[in-house]
Amino acid sequence: LASKEDVQYILDQANRVLEPKLRADEIIGVYAGLRPLVANNKSATTTKLSREHTVDRPAAGFVSIAGGKYTTYRVMAKDVVDRAVIELRRLTQESVTEKLPLIGADGYFALEQQKERIAQESGLDVETVKHLLNRYGALISEILEIIEEQPKLATKLGADLPYIKAEIVYATSHEGARSVDDVISRRTRLSFEAVNHGVHLADEVAALI
């Protein structure tokens, strides 16, 4: 959980450029986490440590990675695989992740140009279609199939959120979610985007899974 000092630090930084200024009583939710940084004996504070990752071979047949961040996960994976390939004496090929589109990426731009048609045919509003395209890309077709089978799942999950109920069903039927926490914290961004980490949505989510 974020401390008061964490919250005040963010407010101070944001208020350097925002007008009107943000106030602590306007915050609807906070979170904090630990970043796995690579130690550096020359640095006395974590704020000056590099966010880069490092790949190591601490023992024969064992490749490890430390540091890094969410946004560089594909580069991290590539570096680990490529190092493992060396260990395997090139019995397999190096990583090809940079050539592989993310799931749902193929056809995304064509569908984005057709969002009005998709909205008209599905009965959804255009903003919801844009939300679904940004979350699922070309896999939006699987969400639309769920709605076609159960039209009531096209309704919103909370008036102030972009999510629809079909996404909760999809999380369990297609993405392996097994609990309310799986859905709120992992398959969606409700724990970040909803007030109080989405706790007030728990009963509604539970009824859908």
Model-predicted segments: where are they?
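C-terminal accessory subdomains/tails of enzymes that are appended
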Residues: 1-209
